Amino acid sequence: MKKLITLILIGVLFMSCSKEKDVAVISTQFGDMVVEFYPEIAPMHVESFTILAKEGYFDGTTFHRVMPGFVIQGGDPNSKDTNRLNDGSGGRAGKFFGIGRENDPDTWMIPGEFNDKLHVKGTLSMARTPDPDGASSQFFVCNASRPDLDGQYTVFGQVIKGLEVIDQIINVNTPRRENRGYQGPDVDNPFEKVEMTVKIMKHSEAMKG
């Protein structure tokens, strides 16, 4: 009987561990943000982000658009180079979702998965072109509530640990902060790069410490 109970407990523990959700850990020089996903409402966006993160696609990219009261935006591979002016113009989906040329990954985009989740502080949402089905790898995290974004961009996650990191990032120096009249394409791009790495791990592991 004791052996049976032990086996049952082991089985329950195994099932519990196997069902544990994955989260993303976005690490910067200011600390880590732990993000939970919403696969039930934005499955393609979660899948694409997860694929790219596991590939190391985001590692070394930056938050190239930092706007207090709005968002911090990143995920563009162009931000890995030394040209500040091309940041925000690159990216691709993690796999072929039916948009773009299947044999050309650089053209892959994600169809819109607009939902009822609100854009509040810590919301993880996907940037896109003017095309509703024009999301790639670029994402943003809200640093304030932005109801004007609700239903216009796909929310696919939420920061559950590390909100203070957002507060530190939005206080970095940018061309706009130094010169309100500046209108270059890098107007909100920090002078000192805010680089990131993104790892996918189990919730319990990410929440340690």
PLM regions: where:
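Cyclophilin-like peptidyl-prolyl cis-trans isomerases
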Residues: M15-G209
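Sec-dependent N-terminal signal peptides
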Residues: L4-F14
